[in-house]
Amino acid sequence: ALCYKHEIEKTLRTPDYAGFQLLGLNDFPGQGSAIIGLLDVFYEERGYITSKEIRRFCGPTVPLARIPKFTYKNDETFHATIEISHFGSAALDSAKITYTIKDEYGKIYYKDISNNRTIPIGSCVQLGEVNYSLASITSPAKLNLEVCIEGTHFANDWDFWVYPAVVETNQGNVYITDTFNEKALETLASGGNVLITAARKITYGQGIVQQFT
């Protein structure tokens, strides 16, 4: 569902794009099974996303955001350019748009309101920008930017993550290696601690060349 969201939003942010087609929104049961649909094989909701949630990013009117990245340090500023794709029956007059940043517990860190906006029919309609210093986020946090048009069901949101720029680390008395070698054995035998980090750092045995046969 998240992949569909980003693909569809990318399309809606593209100027002069003629449209898009989604193929196979349900699970495919033939010639083996492909459990990859937003809906199950009976075209019923899977339980992890609802039709109401899908219409936030796939519908006649969709608020959009251009966000350079989704992971930040708290010495940075979150920036987003807000626009909208609107293909309803008429332009939206005197629209009141709210921008909110909150955490997963509902605490609001940022809120801004734009009043009396006229939203014409079309794509890439610019609404404004969001700039928020992340200095007040002192511990790792999952935040959410939501853009809503008051008095309508038109809304969309995006998650992003913030981490401290400086982290105090305590190495402790730990022997770190990528190979279970003699020193690791000696450290364990003497009651010490060993951390083996083998992921993509294996040095022992790299001299063996593998070939296809």
What is the meaning of each model-derived region?
Residues G151-D157:
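Short, exposed coil/turn segments at beta-strand boundaries within extracellular/luminal domains
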Residues F160-T179:
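Low-complexity, Pro/Ser/Thr- and charge-rich linker/hinge segments at domain boundaries
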Residues A1-S94, T100:
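Substrate-binding clefts and catalytic carboxylate motifs of secreted carbohydrate-active enzymes
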Residues P68-F70, S114-P120, S133-L134:
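Beta-strand-rich interaction surfaces with strong enrichment in secreted/lumenal proteins
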Residues D27-A34, I108, K183, I202-Y204:
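Flexible loop/turn segments at secondary-structure boundaries
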Residues D75-R117, L127-N131, P140-E150:
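Beta-strand-rich binding/interaction modules
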Residues G19-G24, I176, V194-T197:
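Structural recognition of the beta-strand scaffold that forms the well-ordered cores
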Residues F180-T213:
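A glycine-rich, often tryptophan-bearing local segment used as a flexible ligand/cofactor-contacting loop or short
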